[in-house]
Curated annotation (Swiss-Prot):
Known pathway: Pyrimidine metabolism; UMP biosynthesis via de novo pathway; UMP from orotate: step 2/2
Gene Ontology terms: biological process: 'de novo' pyrimidine nucleobase biosynthetic process; 'de novo' UMP biosynthetic process
Reactions accelerated catalytically: orotidine 5'-phosphate + H(+) = UMP + CO2
SUPFAM superfamilies documented for this protein: Ribulose-phoshate binding barrel
Subunit structure: Homodimer.
Top enzyme class: lyase
Binding site for substrate: 17, 38, 65-74, 122, 184, 193, 213-214
Classification via PROSITE patterns: OMPDECASE
Lineage: Bacteria, Bacillati, Cyanobacteriota, Cyanophyceae, Acaryochloridales
The protein's name: Orotidine 5'-phosphate decarboxylase
Keyword annotations: Decarboxylase, Lyase, Pyrimidine biosynthesis
Amino acid sequence: MFNSQAAVASKIIVALDVPNLEVAIATIHRLPQVQFWKVGLELFCASGPMILDVLKDQGKRIFLDLKLHDIPNTVAAAARAIAPYGVDFVTIHTATGLTGLKTAQAALGESATQLIGVTLLTSIGADTLQQELQIPLDPATYVECMANLAHQAGLAGIVCSPQEAARVKQRWGENFLRICPGIRPLGSATGDQARSLTPNAAFAAGASYLVIGRPILQAADPAAAFDDLCSSLV
């Protein structure tokens, strides 16, 4: 699937889902081979931009997963504030709507940061979507609708489950990124993920990047777990 472990590692985003800056720094040092880290709400709320400085000082790529979701003026202001951080990706909920997506994209200005639309959380399955949220669509159709908004707004790509990646790639092409969480290696517990696939299946389905957290960070030997994952995809 890939011609080297380094090529695989560049496409694996490890979720730095830890409670504070001290634990984050220890985790980063324990996994020097990881090139790309996801910083989510928990860690960003605990550490603020300091964690971004730590990662940039070590030459790491950063996926800032804040899932912006507010009125257009507010998401634009947030995007404008994020731009100087110099992260690679930042996320926004596509349910913000087309106007909000466009204004947030415009607010990034000349920044190299790419805006990524979150379509449907991978913890949400058909029952939750249709019965609790009262959206009368199956997850794949809903994701395609949200991906269409992101594409219209000029976003770089979307976050979707690996189960929808092929459909998105077929419609919008290779350059419209598909970043896929909900990845569970064989033998791993699915936990709270309702729409998941194995790493091999996810890349085969058309994922551009995989986001993997617990199967690596909660392993007895996280570094070995990451290396084994990369080896399995070469």
